[in-house]
């Protein structure tokens, strides 16, 4: 399941490369908020402080970087902006993903692979996250939505062990 549907981006030569936004389909606001001029200014500030390090890329970003999924079961919430609370939600169409949840409550949900984000204790301990707000969109990366439920369950069980 993983090899057939996920490995092309998350376990291949594409690791560390930029996947075009049009291909991934996720919220573009992070790209729009960090332009090349921002990197130029940040690199100058670091250099002015006397810090020697490799600078930030000074070109305008065009997409998001493909990453390994090792340990993904403990990296919730998901997508680049943390807009999807569980892996099970990520395998649903964006229209069915939660529109509001609470981030910051650190009780793990092993069945759905993420952190509990809807119960009263999550509301008390967490911060409200609304996907309708600019930059918080949970659309895109709808690669698992067509899988039968049994295959989604198998994929979730697989990533729990990697």
What are these model-predicted stretches?
Residues 1-162:
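Periplasmic c-type cytochrome electron-transfer domains
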């Amino acid at each position: 399941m993983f090899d057939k549907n996920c490995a092309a981006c998350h376990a291949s030569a594409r690791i560390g490369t930029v996947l075009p936004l049009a291909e991934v389909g996720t919220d573009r606001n992070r790209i729009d908020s960090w332009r090349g001029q921002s990197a130029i200014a940040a690199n100058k500030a670091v250099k002015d402080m006397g810090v020697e390090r490799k600078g930030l890329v000074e070109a305008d970003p065009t997409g998001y970087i493909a990453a390994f999924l090792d340990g993904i079961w403990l990296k919730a919430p998901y997508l680049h902006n943390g807009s999807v609370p569980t892996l099970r939600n990520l395998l649903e169409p964006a229209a069915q993903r939660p529109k509001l949840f609470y981030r910051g409550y650190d009780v793990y949900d092993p069945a759905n692979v993420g952190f509990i984000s809807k119960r009263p204790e999550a509301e008390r301990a967490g911060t409200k996250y609304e996907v309708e707000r600019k930059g918080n969109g949970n659309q895109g990366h709808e690669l698992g939505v067509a899988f039968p439920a049994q295959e989604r369950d198998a994929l979730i069980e697989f990533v729990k062990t990697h």
